[in-house]
Amino acid sequence: MAGKTAEAIVRTKGNTYPGTILPEKSRRAGSPRSKPAARIRRRVDWRGWVFMGPFVVVFVFVFVVPVVYAVYLSFFQQRMVGGTVFAGLANYRRLVADTHFWQSVSRVALFTLVQVPVMLFLAAVLALAIDSMKLHGMKFFRITTFLPYAVPAVVSTLIWGFVYGSKYGLVGSVNSLLGTQWDVFNPRVLLAAIGNINTWEYTGYNMLIFYSALSVIPHSLYEAAAIDGASEWQIIRKIKLPELRGSLAITVIFSIIGSFQLFNEPSILQNMVPGNAITTDYTPNMYAYTLSFTGNQSTYAAALAIVMAAITMAIAYTVQISSLKNTMK
């Protein structure tokens, strides 16, 4: 046959006629590929943006705008004469030399180093105990362990404040019974007393995270380990604990952030503790609150808040990177 030809399928009104021979030139001319790209119009699907729009609006106005405004305020100073004036990095230079600020930071850092490991250890033990399925009344035990987290922090602190009272609380009753003179509000042990309140409040929450991670482990692994003669401790050490790495990283990050934001407990106990054991700069958040609402230094408080946010983010990011490296090993 003269010229290049190709077998094609001619479609007319929905009917197909196989075997029809068309010249290659004609076939190419009728091909959809010959249409210019400009004629192909892609419709933009806006449904995803419609669903995401409310979240973006709330996120911008609740998170982005306050952070940007705090950064903006931190570059100004409030003066008796002249009002609010631009000061550049003066607030940050003042903060570096502020001993009250660094004392409060060191206090919450010590609080974090002691309280967070103790709390997470107790939460892991409770999660392993519930996951063992050997406890009587397991559902009741799980609910009662989580219940303190449902109690508002203000109420929890007030309850523990009355328990700690050496004259009117449980500690006072024990002192009268045993003839002792325990004082939980002593400045030397006050930080540990606050840590006990936080541990009581958040152990159940972290326990639930650990228990959720344990509950997704296939039971076939336990059965295979039992057939191989593994003991309960070996199952915990070789199967359960490695599965807690991901949830452990999450709980550590959340706990560090919460510890550096310590405010409710010392602020409420301040009026219950005799003397001046809890000062207005006991924690960074209390110091920022005092500067902003009592000392009329909101711009300096904004600089303090920005620095604390940077410190907390750096620590949380370090923990996350370390966790990812351990997971990839």
Segment roles from a protein language model:
Residues 1-52, 135-139, 320-329:
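Transmembrane alpha-helical segments of polytopic membrane transport and secretion proteins
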Residues 44-329:
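A structural signal for multi-pass alpha-helical bundles of membrane permease subunits
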